[in-house]
Amino acid sequence: MFSHVVIFWTKPENANAAADLIAGAEKYLRPVPVIRSFHVGRMVSSPRAVVDQSYQVALNLTFDSKQAEEEYQVHPLHLDFVEKVFKSNCARAVIYDFE
């Protein structure tokens, strides 16, 4: 299994950016056939100091292999998400990939 986690910081000037990122991920990314599991959501506040609360949205995708994740990266729906959703709503992103 290969995991691809993306942490998004939204553009502060766009009050709807978090909702737009979540809706866009549902529309463009969930249907990509090589994705094994899909989960997107808002940051959950926590009283624990060790929990990062600086971001607004997280995306967690799993794939059967690194090769499947590489196919996802060039899939037309992923490219649409980047152009139509990510660029207009996201100020910063950090990605964690692991096996």
Sequence positions of predicted segments:
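Short S/T/G/P-rich N-terminal loop/turn motif that feeds into the first structured element of a domain
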Residues: 1-56, 60, 64-74, 97-99
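Short, compact, well-ordered microdomains
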Residues: 76, 80-81
